[in-house]
């Protein structure tokens, strides 16, 4: 059982990426300025109340996951919130893991990086190792290159899970395909450099934002990509 925590606004998406496939829709706000976010105190109280209730009912979570409709590391109090979560986890369900789903762009901030290194599972996005594909697929609102993202991910020294979404089709009249030989070759080289504990490979499963004709990648193709990762000695997980 996973207990999800959303640090973004309830009624809008807060993210510095605007991924063309995002199930949360298009990004309306790319920074936290002027946005009302749950306070560290509110998150602490809500999490403690939920964990206490689960303890009373004998329902233990396997993992406490920071995800939601946006990028959790954009919350200005994420280091303290993670510290609070670890304390509460240890108090109520010490066997549960804490996970963060992130696009890794905030890893260059020392306090954020140190906070993420404390959690059990960092599940971090890398949809491509090519600059142009990142620009089209992820549409970051800052100038960030594939090399910068890869260097960010290398800072975890293998203590992370890479999550990659593969898709094909068209978006705003442009061909979309991050499964070409060129894409896979560059991506595999990046995976080898990062040397993660695991790679999660998946494709779209829900409706995507308007403006595109995006297609799922067949399971057989995903499994083939996974087999190439396995040859690097890295564990893989395929879904979709």
Protein language model features and the residues they cover:
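N-terminal pre-triad scaffold of radical SAM enzymes
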Residues: 1-25, 63-65
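Short strand-loop junctions, especially beta-strand C-caps/beta-turns
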Residues: 6-8, 67-69, 165-167, 204
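Short, acidic Gly/Pro/Ser/Thr-rich loop/turn segments
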Residues: 10-12, 29, 131, 169
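Conserved Radical SAM active-site core
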Residues: 21-118
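Short, conserved loop/turn and helix-capping segments at secondary-structure boundaries
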Residues: 37, 143, 215-219, 223
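Conserved AdoMet/S-adenosylmethionine-binding subsite of the radical SAM
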Residues: 74-216
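Binuclear metal-ion centers of metallo-dependent hydrolases, dominated by the metallo-beta-lactamase
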Residues: 217-240
